């Protein structure tokens, strides 16, 4: 993972400009009490009315300059934090895309959504408005204390002592909030997961009349999320009033001490007025400490969560000595392949080969590992023992990009994106595919008949996961997507189960016409594989039998 410093370092010049604008704005702020001191001592008490116009003009000019540099400061911090947030989100999403399937087997989608969106937002906020205030508070305090020591060094020890006490309280508060925010971040991910699963499966929920159960499940997590936020609020309200109290009392205490000095002749009235103004400039940083500590603790917890994702390395990667095939013919061989997942034996000593242009049918009982063969061929997982070869080369030596571009797959669990039918079909070859090729693929998959009856035809936007389409329609679009890829290997995982016999027969005719394409067809129905050159059967004993075909 790139450190935060590397993101900030990219835009160091922007931060230098922002901090320089901030320093200038704060320096101008420090002039107000000085001008006020002059007005009291020289104009009101000294009767020098001739300088009043200059002093008032100075106040106006200082105000204009303060506004200009304040705008530059805030705009630059907001702009830079937005840029860094976008880059962090992009890098995190890119890293997630590189992770192996095993990681997604063990991680909820809602958790990843929370990390990419909510946690990056909190870090972005810390690098923007919150970070700006933290730097501003620090510089402001330094400038104010310098001015206060210049006016009366003895009285300056009072605000210094108070600020040190507030800093200690802020550290204690941060430590208490740190664990709470980690729990809040975890529960936010769980809550997002529950909501995402429920909304994605709303038809199943309604079909089984499980609305009440799902509501109770959501409310239980919502209540825990609420309780954690209340715990955070209790910590905040326990300490935050202290900062506010000190902020209100400090100017009063300085006024009393300064008044005594004025009466004793040790300080002018104008100097006292200026000193009180400076003390008020001390109070807002102290009042901000509680709020800043709260937001920074939240950002730190989010950073830790994101860091954990970056600590996960992909299990499936390109080998150091990648082999690039000049041409992929489509010869597939499984050589004594065994596969275990989480200690469970899925495949055991599986061997078969499919020559270029031939068709292999795979049948078997539920749970016998038929779909795991697809996982092996795509290198979603690596074999525990044995090897899978493509054109005689172990697929572990072939680049993942070339391997997966060489295999088109129609998965059992059809997933269509919330986009147009056109975009869903040309997903595998998006950059070069023309409309006539899209229509040809749809016709080959027997999908053009229902697509062209729609009002928008190929521009029809389908819902998430193909909501609004029948199971057979979704399967046909998925088949069209695979055919449009024109890969040398085509794998179909029980992908005609929702089709009627006539449509299935037409698709089989299309598959038979693909003479140069190696086809692996996984099915439960014998009708789906009856035209295969060879059929293997996978019983639950993890090995296979070869069935004769005619």
Please report, for each region that a protein language model flagged, where it lies by residue:
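A short, hydrophobic C-terminal helix/tail in secreted or cell-surface proteins
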Residues: 546-550
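Short intracellular "coupling" helices and adjacent cytoplasmic loop segments at the cytosolic face
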Residues: 45-46, 82, 90-114, 118-120, ...
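Membrane-integrated ABC transporters
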Residues: 1-29, 36, 44-56, 65, ...
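Hydrophobic alpha-helical transmembrane bundles that constitute the permease/transmembrane domains
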Residues: 23-34, 63-71, 123-126, 130-142, ...
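Transmembrane helices of ABC transporter permease
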Residues: 10, 14-27, 57-58, 62-65, ...
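ABC-type nucleotide-binding domain
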Residues: 319, 325-545
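Helix-loop-helix
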Residues: 48-50, 54, 147-161, 231-304, ...
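An intracellular "coupling" helix at the cytosolic face of ABC transporter transmembrane type-1 domains
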Residues: 101-102, 118-127, 131, 135, ...
């Amino acid at each position: 993972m790139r450190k935060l410093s590397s993101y900030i370092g990219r835009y160091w010049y922007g931060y230098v400009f922002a901090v320089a604008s901030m320093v200038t704005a704060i320096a101008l702020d420090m002039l107000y009490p000085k001008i006020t001191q002059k007005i009291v001592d020289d104009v009101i008490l000294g009767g020098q009315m001739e300088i009043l116009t200059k002093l008032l003009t100075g106040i106006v000019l200082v105000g204009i300059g303060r506004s200009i540099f304040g705008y530059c400061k805030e705009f630059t911090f907001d702009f830079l934090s937005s840029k860094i947030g976008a880059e962090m989100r992009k890098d995190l999403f890119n890293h997630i895309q590189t992770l192996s399937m095993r990681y997604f087997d063990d991680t909820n989608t809602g958790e990843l959504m929370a990390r990419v969106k909510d946690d990056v937002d909190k870090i972005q906020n810390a690098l923007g408005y919150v970070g700006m205030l933290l730097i501003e508070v620090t510089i402001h305090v330094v400038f104010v204390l310098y001015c206060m020591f210049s006016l009366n060094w003895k009285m300056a020890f009072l605000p210094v002592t108070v600020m040190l006490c507030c800093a200690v309280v802020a550290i204690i508060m941060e430590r208490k909030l740190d664990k709470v925010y980690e729990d809040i971040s975890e529960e936010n991910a769980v809550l997002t997961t529950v909501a995402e699963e429920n909304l994605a499966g709303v038809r199943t929920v309604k079909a089984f009349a499980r609305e009440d159960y799902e509501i109770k499940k959501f409310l239980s997590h919502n209540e825990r999320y609420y309780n954690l936020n209340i715990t955070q609020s209790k910590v905040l309200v326990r300490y935050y009033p202290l900062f506010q109290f000190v902020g209100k009392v400090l100017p009063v205490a300085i006024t009393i001490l300064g008044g005594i000095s004025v009466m004793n002749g040790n300080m002018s009235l104008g100097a006292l007025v200026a000193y009180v103004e400076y003390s008020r400039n001390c109070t807002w940083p102290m009042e901000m400490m509680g709020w800043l500590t709260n937001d920074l603790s939240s950002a730190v917890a989010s950073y830790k969560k994101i860091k954990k994702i970056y600590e996960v390395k992909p299990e499936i990667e390109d080998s150091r000595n990648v082999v690039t095939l000049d041409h992929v013919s489509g010869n597939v061989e499984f050589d004594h392949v065994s596969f275990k997942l989480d200690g469970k034996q899925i495949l055991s000593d599986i061997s078969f080969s499919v020559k270029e242009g031939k068709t292999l049918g795979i049948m078997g009982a539920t749970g016998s590992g038929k779909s795991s063969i697809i996982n092996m061929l795509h290198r979603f997982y690596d074999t525990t023992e044995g090897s899978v070869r493509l054109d005689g080369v172990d697929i572990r030596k072939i680049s993942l990009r070339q391997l997966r571009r060489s295999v088109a797959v129609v998965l059992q669990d059809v997933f269509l994106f919330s986009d147009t039918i056109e975009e869903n079909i040309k997903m595998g070859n998006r950059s070069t595919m023309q409309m006539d090729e899209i229509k040809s693929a749809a016709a080959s998959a027997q999908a053009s008949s229902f697509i062209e009856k729609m009002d928008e035809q190929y521009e029809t936007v389908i819902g998430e996961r193909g909501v609004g389409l029948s199971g057979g329609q979704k399967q046909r679009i998925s088949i069209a997507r695979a055919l449009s890829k024109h890969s040398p290997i085509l794998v179909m995982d029980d992908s005609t189960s929702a089709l009627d016999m006539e449509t299935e027969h037409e698709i089989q005719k299309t598959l038979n016409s693909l003479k140069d394409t190696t086809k692996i067809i996984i099915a439960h129905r014998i009708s789906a594989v009856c035209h295969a050159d060879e059929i293997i059967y996978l019983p639950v004993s993890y090995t296979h039998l070869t069935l004769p075909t005619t």
